[in-house]
Amino acid sequence: RLVGSEMCIRDRAGSTFPDDCNIEIHGKTLQYVSRGGLKLEKAMKHFDITMDGKVCMDIGASTGGFTDCMLQNGAKKVYAVDVGYGQFAWKLRQDERVVCMEKTNIRYVTPNDIDDELDFASVDVSFISLTKVLGPARALLKDGGEMVCLIKPQFEAGREKVGKKGVVRDKSVHEEVVNNIISFALSNGFSVLDLEYSPIKGPEGNIEYLVHIKKTDDPIKEESVDIHSVVEAAHGELDRK
């Protein structure tokens, strides 16, 4: 969005202005407290997921974009988990449907730490592999509970495969990373239902992927899950932006 002050235009967060200046906001404002909500919004539409009446967990909540999206789509309760502190949006902190769990590492959260079995959980974490998160998250889900996870190649590929500024551009590495995560999920009690790419890139320009999984004792990978096609489509669309 654009902020105007005495004919000056600012389009970046963190700009400062005199106390007595007139400020106008122009342009379309974001529907959620952060752009993370756009990722879950696409996942819900593409994977045909509903939030109505569900108890959810937002793992890697940060500002709370995913939490906001869940609530706006009818979630009954959201546990917002993040190792950080002070980032979570004020309006969400005040929402009685939200349990804010800051300074909390999901790897050490057990069913005894929450009051409910989860119907749904999302994962959007950085500087840690999904392989460290899926096991603890599974223990919190009810049987048949579902998850949408962001697969981030920059945090899954080996250091030798990560380029400048932490960006992974090689499509073959993307396919390898996604395949590894899917294989891990299948080996650890999750069916893999669908795969799509995130509608927005990560902060440094990394393409990321959304995977839809389900807790089960008999894991399967749906035949419609086509890693190569999704990676190709992601690069075809997002590399132009």
Language model features: what each stretch is:
Residues 2-9:
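Short, small-residue-biased leader/transition segments that mark boundaries at the very start
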Residues 52-62:
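Conserved class I S-adenosyl-L-methionine
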Residues 63-74:
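Conserved SAM-binding loop of SAM-dependent methyltransferases across substrates and taxa
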Residues 76-79:
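Short beta-strand element of Class I
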Residues 81-128, 132:
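S-adenosyl-L-methionine
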Residues 131-146:
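A short glycine-rich, Lys/Arg-flanked "PGG" loop and its adjoining helix->strand segment in the class I
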Residues 153-169:
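Short, glycine-/aromatic-enriched active-site segment of Class I SAM-dependent methyltransferases
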Residues 207-241:
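Flexible, glycine-/basic-rich loop-and-beta segments that form/coincide
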